[in-house]
Curated annotation (Swiss-Prot):
Functional pathway: Secondary metabolite biosynthesis
Function: FAD-dependent monooxygenase; part of the gene cluster that mediates the biosynthesis of azaphilones, a class of fungal metabolites characterized by a highly oxygenated pyrano-quinone bicyclic core and exhibiting a broad range of bioactivities. In the first step, the non-reducing polyketide synthase azaA forms the hexaketide precursor from successive condensations of five malonyl-CoA units, presumably with a simple acetyl-CoA starter unit.
Glycosylation, residue list: N75, N87
Keywords of the record: FAD, Flavoprotein, Glycoprotein, Membrane, Monooxygenase, Oxidoreductase, Transmembrane, Transmembrane helix
GO biological process: secondary metabolite biosynthetic process
Induction cue: Expression is under the control of the azaphilone cluster-specific transcription factor azaR.
Record's protein name: FAD-dependent monooxygenase azaH
């Protein structure tokens, strides 16, 4: 392991982990990514990125935003429309219209969607060969006996690795979060929000024939009592992505998993009193259907995202309900800040030729800077995502724009200022 560089281990090869890896590599920081799956595999269907997230992509590495644009599907309208999916008269959705409750301007090409796997595939192609090691499930992280090696990572297959810094991008069921916060602590786990989402992709020719062009060409939120659904086009308009949310007062029945395939009848029943548009959309979904429990960190938010040379990012840090459609974008913001602070720390290591203790102190300062800059905003997103489905127009408007209009450049300036203050504090001590 090099003595004049900061070597980083990233746990998890999802969108946040690979985005972060690309940004660090572009800044000359050595990275290894460890992924428990057999290959690149992004579960889920559609995903969208808001304007702030796209700006953060460019800050991390302009190739990332270019990769997203290659797979993104433009909306026919630059307005996000919230419609009454419940009180719709008539029987044929091609001849009826859901009442527009309100709409929010997204900006030009401001909230485009894509298929998750398509985007992850584009990102993976940007990675140099050998950066990602698959079938590596993390067991523990602890200081290495030789402090020049930093942290010792033990995997469930009995192998080990070392790195100066460890970043957990391992999702909602994060092992790194458990290690960081304590396995039995309430903040170490995400908790059921008492909603689940039935998710599916409908071939666009079938959706267009059943619903009409206007209802499939752009982004809609269909509202009603105890259920609502988000629809938008993906895969260059060849598929309609559907996320149908159902309120569930019961505990999630599967202790060992948060996704399950189940009969569509429960989802059909939840939307049975809705208008013809939503009933038709549900009819077009497959049976059985993928059901996703919505877990988040709202009830027990972490009081820190870092400790020493270990930190968490993305869903591992701030798992949020998807009602804002901004969780993945918040992970990109995390990556932008982490790339910046680790680059600043690496430059100080290279110029000052610090020893192992000095390098460890700089990494700690970098991660504390990240926690200071990102955690408050990320946990606000978790809170707002939990409640937004029940809010009135004015609340939805300002909460949405608080996410979309975030000043990424100001965030990066704050990152530099906080890091320098952290380093100055280390020097005084």
């Amino acid at each position: 392991m090099s003595t004049d560089s900061i070597e980083v281990a990233i746990i998890g090869a999802g969108i946040t982990g690979i985005t972060l890896a690309l940004g660090l590599l572009s800044r000359g920081i050595p990275v290894r990514v460890y992924e428990r799956a057999r290959d690149f595999h992004e579960i889920g269907a559609g995903i969208g990125f808001t304007p702030n997230a796209e700006w953060a992509m460019k800050v991390v590495d302009p190739r990332i935003q270019a990769a997203f644009k290659r797979v993104a599907t433009p909306n026919a309208s630059d307005w996000f429309q919230w419609v009454d999916g419940f009180n719709e008269s008539g029987t044929d959705p091609r001849e009826t219209e859901e009442q527009l409750l309100f709409k929010i301007y997204l900006g030009e090409r401001g909230f485009e969607g894509c298929h998750r796997a398509d985007f992850l595939g584009e990102l993976a192609r940007l990675l140099p060969e050998g950066v990602v090691t698959f079938q590596k499930a993390l067991d523990t992280v602890e200081p290495a006996a030789d402090n020049s090696l930093g942290q010792l990572l033990r995997f469930q297959d009995g192998t080990t690795a070392t790195a100066h810094a460890v970043i957990g991008c391992d999702g909602i069921r994060s092992r790194v979060r458990q290690i960081l916060l304590g396995e039995d602590h309430p903040t170490a786990s995400a908790h059921y929000s008492h909603k689940y989402a039935a998710r599916g992709l409908i071939p666009m020719d079938r959706a267009r024939e059943a619903l009409g062009e206007d209802k499939v060409a752009t982004r809609f939120m269909h509202l009603g009592p105890d259920a609502h659904a988000l629809t938008f086009p993906v895969s260059h308009g060849s598929l309609l992505n559907v996320v149908a949310f159902v309120t569930d007062p019961n505990p999630w029945p599967y202790a060992d998993r948060w996704t399950a395939q189940g009969p569509k009848k429960d989802v059909t029943a939840a939307f049975s009193r809705f208008g013809p548009t939503m009933r038709t959309i549900i009819d077009l979904l497959p049976d059985p259907i993928d059901q996703w429990a919505v877990f988040d960190t709202y009830d027990h938010p972490p009081n820190t995202y870092s400790r020493g040379a270990v930190c968490i990012a993305g869903d591992a840090a701030h798992a949020a309900a998807p009602h804002h459609g901004a969780g993945a974008g918040c992970g990109v913001e995390d990556a932008a800040v982490l790339c910046a602070v680790l680059h600043m720390a690496a430059k100080k290591v290279n110029t000052a030729k610090t020893g192992s203790e000095g390098k460890a102190a700089l990494i700690t300062a970098a991660f504390e800077t990240y926690d200071s800059v990102c955690r408050e905003r990320a946990q606000w997103l978790v809170e707002s995502s939990r409640v937004i489905g029940n809010l009135c127009h004015d609340e939805v408007y300002w909460r949405s724009h608080r996410i979309w209009d975030y000043d990424i450049d100001a965030m990066m300036r704050e990152t530099a200022e906080v890091f320098e203050a952290q380093v100055a504090g280390v020097a005084r001590n």
